Every structure is written in C-alpha cells, then in structure tokens.
C-alpha cells in the first residue's frame, strides 16, 4: 500500500445545503498505513451555523441532521466497496486545524484557534470540545440529555471498512455525496 504523508490531505468541497465539508485522512503517526481514520473537518463558519456554544465546554447540537446524513452516506458507500477496518469521524473546527501530537495512549490530539478535539481512543472515537488548549473536557455526548446521546455517539463514532490508499479519491470522484 502506498504511504501517504499525513500533511497530504484529500480535500473537496461538498455542498450539502448547510455549508462546506473538507475531507482529510490520517492515522497515528506520519503516514497512512493499514488502518486509518477518515475525518470530516467542518469549517468554523459551518460550526456556528450548526452548533450553539453554551459555554466553554458544553455544546448543543443544532440542525446537525445534514452533517450526519453526509457521514452516513459516506459510510454506506465505503462499507460496500472496501474491506479494511477503519473509522469515520466528524471533527468540528476551522479549516486550518493542525495535528500537534500523538500520545503514548494513541489519542490523537487536534488543536486549532478556538476548539480542541481528541479523536481515536482504542477503537472508540470521541468528540471533545474546549477553548482551553491545555485541558481536556468531558465527552460531548455525556453533557447532553439522554434523547440526544445516541445521535451524538453516531455523529462521532462511525466504524466502516475502506482502502486507505483510494477511499477518498473514489468517494469524491463518484460524487456520492
């Protein structure tokens, strides 16, 4: 399998009625090898269009069905076409998000100007939100009411199967979204 540098992200603009979604792919380390993560990075403007910030560490879902639908369509397509285990996650933040470090616990820490998301923890993907770069807040879904928890779990954790080398190019070229 061809190794792809972590900085070489596959990006495409997907108009879905709610805004623009950028595609990226990366794994724990400098290259994409074997299992990987396909991360939907939502732009900062789309974040404010679809989410309502209550305070520094609590976020309420607003009109998230559109973003969720995009992830679902992608997962359905990839699960049919490919056979390698991976995970699709949704990460909210600005488009200039940078990967800062990968800890020994294999937790991928992603930080941008305002928000911090920690993704990928032993096969389970969580979404964390914080305005403090030095602290990790509680998982988002634990802050919501019971009726919202299942939605957020699916919104943040989406296991599928795909071929790391070709998945993004195929999805975008076929314009399945």
Features from the language model and the residues they span:
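DNA polymerase processivity clamps
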Residues: 1-177
């Amino acid at each position: 399998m061809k190794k792809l540098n972590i900085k070489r992200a596959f990006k495409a603009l997907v108009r879905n009625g709610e805004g623009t979604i950028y595609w990226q792919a990366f794994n724990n380390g400098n290259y994409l090898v074997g299992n990987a993560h396909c991360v939907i990075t939502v732009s900062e403007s789309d974040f404010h269009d679809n989410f309502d910030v209550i305070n520094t560490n609590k976020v309420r879902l607003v009109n998230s069905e559109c973003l969720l639908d995009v992830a679902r369509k992608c997962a359905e397509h990839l699960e049919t076409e490919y056979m390698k285990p991976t995970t699709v996650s949704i990460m909210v933040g600005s488009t200039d998000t940078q990967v800062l470090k990968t800890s020994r616990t294999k937790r991928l820490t992603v930080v941008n100007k305002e928000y911090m998301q920690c993704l990928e923890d032993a096969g389970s993907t969580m979404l964390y939100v914080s305005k403090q770069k030095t602290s990790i807040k509680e998982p988002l879904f634990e802050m919501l009411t019971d009726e919202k928890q299942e939605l957020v779990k699916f919104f943040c954790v989406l296991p599928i199967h795909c071929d790391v080398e070709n998945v993004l190019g195929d999805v975008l070229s076929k314009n399945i979204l």
